Amino acid sequence: MLNFFRSTYLSLFLFLALSTLVITKAQSNDKILFHDSHFHITNYIQEGIELEFYVDSIMGDKVGRSTVFGLPLQQQWSYRVTGEAAPTYYLDTDAPLYYYSFCDAWIAAQYLSLPKEKQERLDPMIIGFNVTDMYAADHIKRVLTTFPGVFTGIGEFSIHKEFVSAKISGDVASLTDPALDRIFDFCAETGLISIIHNDIDNPFPKPNKPNYVKGFQELIKRHPDAIIIWAHLGLGRIIKPIEDMGTLFEEMLADPAYNHLYFDLSWDETAKWLDYNDKSLENTARIIGKYPDRFLFGTDNVAPDKQEKQLYVYHLYDRLWKLVGEEVTYKVCIGNYEKLFNDARKKVRAWEKANVK
């Protein structure tokens, strides 16, 4: 009888202990506000923060998972232009930007130094390629085969970007460049997910002048097997919404030809345009509510030094989260990320297994 009571009490103790662990884990998950679909670990002079600091201090218990990429462009410090004043941003100087490939190896080295549980929270992206170079796809393949098990996608890379595109040394990026087609063909082959920045319009549009919509649409339709995320909805610091933009997005979202295209709500500048007035915010909420599986959230922060900067961007969208409701907010901030990036991880690892010697 004594052994029976001992066994019963032991079973009860173990049950309560395990229940506490489950509750604690659930409570911990409840603290997570979002997965970050758009995050830069380094800036335009390739300075930033270490990945372990990012996971421990910036993500912490508020950000569950995150993409990780630097910036594929290095700002040149030309003594002839700025003298001893070293530029740290592309607007600090008239000197050009140039493509910088070492960023991929740096991120891979940082990632591989992390313990497994921290690696699982990150999705590194390949960005160190020149989008005008027919060899760009070869660079992406070379990075994958050199660092198998690390990367989930490519990007954020830019085609048309206010003030940046014109500063880059060499050829100007174009939506019709065969080099870009080779990149997306390789993404389709491997399962790499891609994040592309392409402004929806010119910085200072003129009446009756074409914007970048048609060229972008044609590019997307040429690559139905590549999963593509359109960064910032095509908006920017001064790239404002075009006329009937809501109608345009609804038409694209309803068209099966764009079923592989997703949209990220990222950057404080994007929040500014979406919450420009009550009407614009309500229209945005209506469209997202109608197509909740096609949107993701990201901060677009660049190497922040404290967690508050991550949460600041998230809370800029608070009025939107309230309008779309908890279920849609969960999909945009967490669910869609997990669906897309988990699938990409699986496909890329399978490709690596079949192709890396």
Region annotations inferred by a language model:
Residues L2-R6, L10, I23, Q27-S37, ...:
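Mid-to-C-terminal alpha-helical segments outside catalytic/metal-binding sites
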Residues A26-A109, P115:
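An N-terminally biased module of ancient metal coordination in phosphate/nucleic-acid-related enzymes
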Residues H35-F39, R65-F69, L122-I127, G153-G155, ...:
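Hydrophobic faces of well-ordered beta-strands that scaffold small-molecule active sites
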Residues F39-L51, S78-Y79, S165-V172, T270-K272, ...:
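Acidic/histidine-rich helix-loop elements
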Residues H40-T42, L71-P72, I127-V131, F157-H160, ...:
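Active-site beta-loop-alpha junctions enriched in small/polar residues
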Residues V55-K62, I107-R121, I140-T152, F184-E189, ...:
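Acidic (Asp/Glu)-rich catalytic clusters
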Residues E84-N202:
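Active-site gating/metal-coordination segments in enzymes
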